[in-house]
Amino acid sequence: MTKFVGCIDLHDGQVKQIVGGTLKDNDDSLETNFVSKYPPSYYAQLYLENRIEGCHVIKLGPNNDAAAMEALNAAPGFLQVGGGINDENCLQWLEKASKIIVTSWLFTKEGTFLMDRLQLLSNKCGPDRIVVDLSCRRTPDSKWVVAMNKWQTLTTLELNKETFTELSKYTDEFLIHAADVEGLCKGIETDLVTKLYEWTKDINKEVKIVYAGGAKSISDLELVDKLSNGTVDLTYGSSLDIFGGKLVRFQDCCEWNSKHN
């Protein structure tokens, strides 16, 4: 059954909601939907108190380590953390995080996927402590390709059945941001959600999939549940009232999870 999963997006040490496609090294082009008056620990405790499991803390760029650690310290062993994770710092973050989320370190600067790095990380941390972030963009020929470097660089890794089958040997969970619709609150990428189910349904082990991007209504939980046969979980961001949104109530998301536990 599809569940609601929470997020804490950090930019320059603050909890923010950002239009994903505008996130670049130069902040002049950044479009921000929301900057919270609350510290990261507030959201960590909120998710913990409501038992919203599998929530992730994402460090978007530099100057976020202290803020991320504040969130993790407020809910030790409960939250996942991503952003700048590599083989040298992974175990340090896992002292307080339930799982690490890894993306850019698995690729060369040009965007070539390095399977040996995932194998190394899996051996070091265990596949059950790793989330592989396969956040992606749709190409003109309707393929879904993993994007890195704040979702600005398209990599050589295409999302398909073969990719998920191979990577699932080294991880139990995938996080997929649909970068083209992230932060727009104009609806989820239904094609992608359907594909995520089709690509992973025959994997011979239990794999968790979390989708983020564009969710704008509480009914999107039901939609994702239908499209994915209950195998894909859903994250809300800018549409959620706890992030300044007016479209979705956090309490309704909590009630959905309780009802479908």
UniProtKB/Swiss-Prot annotation:
Belongs to the HisA/HisF family. InterPro entries: Aldolase_TIM, His6-like_euk, His_biosynth, Isoase_HisA-like, RibuloseP-bd_barrel. NCBIfam families: hisA_euk. Keywords: Amino-acid biosynthesis, Cytoplasm, Histidine biosynthesis, Isomerase. It is found in: Cytoplasm. The keyword Plastid does not apply. GO terms for cellular component: cytoplasm. Its EC number is 5.3.1.16. It catalyses: 1-(5-phospho-beta-D-ribosyl)-5-[(5-phospho-beta-D-ribosylamino)methylideneamino]imidazole-4-carboxamide = 5-[(5-phospho-1-deoxy-D-ribulos-1-ylimino)methylamino]-1-(5-phospho-beta-D-ribosyl)imidazole-4-carboxamide. This is 1-(5-phosphoribosyl)-5-[(5-phosphoribosylamino)methylideneamino] imidazole-4-carboxamide isomerase.
